[in-house]
């Protein structure tokens, strides 16, 4: 890490320092986090599974020791995350000070990252070159995204289950870092991909699809988002294949095919245009995207599209959806037409 930091701070615009900030994350921070998380998962499995081995110590004592080991690993991970958050904040502050990136202060102040107004004149002059300045923005955006990842990992391993053993995650801090990273360079897709990861974790499938499309339909797309979107749509298609609404579509097509009277025949049959909840409605919207993007069943997609559209028109009259929901549906539709 010392070598990487020396390259980042002293040879920032050289070829040797290209993407060195990513190396800092992957080779040091993420490597340790992955190791500790793997050990935590292993410790959880040992605590969950009752010990069956023979030994002098009672089973209760052995299970208590494993629970203590699991708690110790959790504390080590959280402590390491706190140290890394401080490290990345100091690195960002140092870059902003050295190169006089004053226009980033509004973004950093929203994240409570303190910046001193001092800077070196010679380094500030080198950052006036547009290509160099843009490179610094990219570095800071990636570092902010890394800090968002750290806050996300912290929440994943610090959230406490309720009395029903349910865990509710609050990724407010992580989302704030991802959002500010996006604000810094809106034409880069990496922060949107991470926002999609958060949406997936909290069960917001449509929000995840929306963010994956945003990660792809920008000047600098995040290539892994395409694979992530593909997996999410395949999962949605699998869930749709066993859903009750799919059965309604099949029944509607079957009844339409059995209609003998030409005057009563319709080109596309209809199904109920009401969903029990907004969450179910957006899940069906994701299923519609999966049917179209994966080209699984366009006849079914036509029927589902008709029901989705009629429900949306009723939702407008009843004010069931938020303004941001309509915006997301519009953006998702436009992006889907650009990427398929």
Give the residues covered by each predicted segment:
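Extended charged low-complexity segments that act as oligomerization/scaffolding linkers
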Residues: 207, 224, 234-258
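Short coil/turn linking the two alpha-helices of tandem helical-hairpin repeats
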Residues: 33-56, 62, 69, 85, ...
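Extended alpha-helical solenoid scaffold regions that build the rod-like backbones
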Residues: 2-64, 70, 74-77, 246-340
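A conserved position within tetratricopeptide repeats
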Residues: 8, 40-41, 47-48, 85, ...
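Flexible helix-coil transition and linker loops at the boundaries of alpha-helical arrays
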Residues: 87-140, 179-185
